[in-house]
Amino acid sequence: MEKEVHWWDKLGKPQYGSEIVVRVERDIVNFDPYFLEGLTGIFGAWMERLVSDDWTLDPEVWDYKLAWHPSKYQKGHLAESWEFPDQTTHIIHLRKGIHWQDLPPANGREFTADDVVFHYNRLYALGGGFIKPSPSRAADIRFKDLLSVSAPDKYTVVFKFKTQNPESIMETLHNVSLAQCMENPDAVKKWGDVSDWHHAIGTGPFILKDFVAGNFATLVKNPNYWGYDERYPQNKLPYVDKLSYLIMPDENEAIAAMSGGKIDIIPQVTSAHAIAIKKTNPEILQIPTSGGPTVTLQPRNDKPPFNDLRVRKALQLAIDLPSIARFHYGGLVEPYPSTLTSKDMTGWGFPYEQWPQGLKDEYTYNPAGAKKLLADAGYPNGFKTNVVADASSDLELLQIIKSYLADIEIEMEVQLMKTPDWVSFVEIGRKHEQLVYRQYGPLGHTKAPLRIITQFYTGYAANYQMVSDPVFDAFYPRAVAATNEDQLKQVIKEANEHVARQHYVISLLQPRAYALCQPWLKGGYNAQVHSIWMGSGGPSMLSFYGARFWIDHDLKKSMGH
């Protein structure tokens, strides 16, 4: 009998042992999925999801480069299977024999449907004595229709929605999000929450062993992990003995460590750094990521002066995007404004090339036109303003923007904050008065369509611009009601155009970023290397991909490491 050939055979036979070391750009401030602000949690390394990616899927079919994974390419993880008895009911059947890590107070007990109910009740205050939803989920329109979560038996979970449909339910519950990582109820009941890293307990392949803020996090293999490799069903996971994170805000320092073989993965670097390291270390693999950090200047749309569309247009006209593309990015980025949906989501947006000339003119450098708009809005002599900036963002670019605004007599004071402080001040506290600036803005998304359509929804957690526009709010129910992909694409395209015309944010550029990995890191194809930590999967996929990647020991040794 002829041996069956699989596409992954070319990746080599998996090997056990060794360690994967990952560079983390910002400090880790969160160990509890209830507190999602800032996406600086890594709890996806030991907590798991109900549904995950299809590890056996041929990359020629779907390459996981986008943050959005269509439901047809998802498979059960903690869940074994699911069904939809009607349009608004989703029934999950859990795998049997999954156990929590053997740590107190869980002590290795079995994972059951009651644990899933606890997670969703806690996150969305649906019952079980929880009256306050997660700060980040409270305003998430996608879950407004979630009526209840129940467990009719030990391995069955029933979700009841009000007006959604099977496709939107799959996207809402199971698409990539930190909110889907299951925390241990016993730990929450004992300590109130699991924010302290010492209380980290999951069902995943790695156990958090050590953490020093601003320095590192170390995870070790869970000896009692339930999972096996879907490609090699006889292989128990994980392959590596240790998963380590080195917290390195400075990209130059991270590049140096990568060049010296001390880091296996850098999730994201700029084009300039990718070009530089290709010259010094051509053996290091470079994976173009979907889009890149969508830097934007984000005004509060609910307060003067930025509640006036003319003022927001003026700021856009004051900025010379082609010059920034040429001189700041060295010509390594397209000189066009970012749009709500990244160009990488082909067919899902409203790319600049399709804009009518009148709209293009609103994004074309024109300081004289900007001054006229300011005068028409009642600011003939400009005004003073301030911006709360995340210190981990591109501060050189911020100074360039400040200079452009000064040319139209807008004096912008910069208030720098470290990422945790920025999150507390802006994302949680909403204490910013006028402008905010951060590396990862609300444009250029490759996320799920229903996630994109909520970006500027009234009251949504990530709506730092405080936009409240009934026209934009109306896109969400239309998206949920879409009965086919073409209808949904049309809604997303219209939303893109509306955002561009309303100038909710000052659009800048979307540089191409790259993930870097050492050649001895094996198991996945290129896009999946990026998938582990950023882009298509992010922190919630750490346990999934981290368990399935392995180190080619002979290759690493032959390269002197």
Enumerate the predicted regions with their spans.
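Aromatic- and charge-enriched surface segment that lines or borders ligand/interaction sites
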Residues: 78-129, 158, 254-257, 305-307
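Alpha-helical secondary-structure segments
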Residues: 21, 108, 113-118, 154-158, ...
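Short, well-ordered beta-strand elements
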Residues: 17-27, 80, 89-93, 116-119, ...
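Gly/Pro-rich hinge or "lid" segments in bacterial periplasmic/extracellular proteins
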Residues: 52-73, 133, 154, 172-244, ...
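Surface-exposed binding/hinge segments that line
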Residues: 83-85, 91-96, 115, 125-187, ...
